[in-house]
């Protein structure tokens, strides 16, 4: 092993790795990042958006709810549709576009498709680069029908 973690984190359920994913409007993967399972989602959000050529709308779940991230997306020329965290107080949920938020399922569907590959869902690879290669291969297989 090397001096860094190979993006394998520890949780009460055992070793874990998160895949942070950006998809296009058709649900096809554009870019992804790996992180340790115990790391918070918002830590990798700006890096993921930075990799995108064009940012129109960022739709994300409550894990990405942060005002600095919303400002970052606005600076890139996009808008955010992110569910607000409750923080134990009443929040105006009418400010979020619920019709657009329904498209968040495109990301979940992409995860469901790659989790069909056993080597990805259970992560047999010890090295981060090998696991990232397998995830990339699965995403390429999702793109393949577009060109055949």
What are these language model-derived features?
Residues 89-95:
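Short, charged, surface-exposed secondary-structure boundary motifs
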Residues 1-86, 134-138:
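Polybasic low-complexity intrinsically disordered regions
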Residues 71-72, 76-79, 97-148:
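Basic, amphipathic alpha-helical segments enriched in Lys/Arg and hydrophobic/aromatic residues
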């Amino acid at each position: 092993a090397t001096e860094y973690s190979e993006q394998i984190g520890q949780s009460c359920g055992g070793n874990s790795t998160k895949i942070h994913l950006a998809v296009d409007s058709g649900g096809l993967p554009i870019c992804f990042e790996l992180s340790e399972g115990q790391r918070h989602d918002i830590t990798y959000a700006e890096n993921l958006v930075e990799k995108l050529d064009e940012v129109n709308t960022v739709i994300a779940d409550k894990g990405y709810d942060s005002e600095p991230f919303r400002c970052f997306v606005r600076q890139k020329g996009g808008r955010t549709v992110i569910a607000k965290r409750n923080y134990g107080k009443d929040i105006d949920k009418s400010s979020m576009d619920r019709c657009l938020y329904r498209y968040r399922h495109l990301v979940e569907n992409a995860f469901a498709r790659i989790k069909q590959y056993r080597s990805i869902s259970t992560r047999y690879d010890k090295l981060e680069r090998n696991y990232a290669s397998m995830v990339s291969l699965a995403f390429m297989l999702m793109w393949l029908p577009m060109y055949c």
